[in-house]
A protein has these predicted regions:
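Cross-family detector of peptidyl-prolyl cis-trans isomerase
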Residues: 1-138
């Protein structure tokens, strides 16, 4: 088995670095362009921005501003901050760092998927993210 290293942050986010990226690390104020997959903690698939068939996006990445003035859930903001382009991380996001209020991003496009996110906002969610690039202007 591969030697997997998990990082646990002070506020309870646990993540695994799947691979290394290259270039400048993402920071608050940057617009992060990334792919994401969300699952329940039991592995049940909810949505993926990648083009993977039924229940997935069309392959277009998501774009959100990092930092406190953004609308990204805290766990994903923390996960993406410090990542380099090409890097992939898998994280267990606790409810306190997840969808703590309605309208937080990212949101799946379909009604049923949004209901899944809403219905399971009180449990840890698994996110896989791959940072494609960052830019400083929206």
């Amino acid at each position: 088995l591969p030697d997997v290293k998990y990082v646990k942050t002070g506020d309870g986010l646990v993540y695994e670095q799947v691979n290394q990226g290259a270039g400048q690390p993402a920071k608050a104020g940057d617009v992060a362009v990334f792919h994401w997959i969300i699952r329940r903690a039991n592995g049940y698939f909810i949505y993926g921005s990648i083009d993977c068939g039924i229940g997935c996006g069309n392959g277009d990445p998501s774009e959100y501003r990092l930092g406190p003035d953004g609308n990204l859930i805290a766990g994903l903001d923390e996960l993406l901050t410090g990542m380099r382009p090409g890097e992939k991380r898998r994280a267990l996001v606790p409810p306190a760092l997840g969808y703590v209020r309605k309208g937080m991003e990212p949101q799946p496009p379909e009604f049923g998927q949004k209901r899944q996110v809403e219905a399971h906002a009180n449990e840890p969610l698994v996110f896989e993210v791959k940072l494609i690039k960052t830019r400083t202007k929206a």
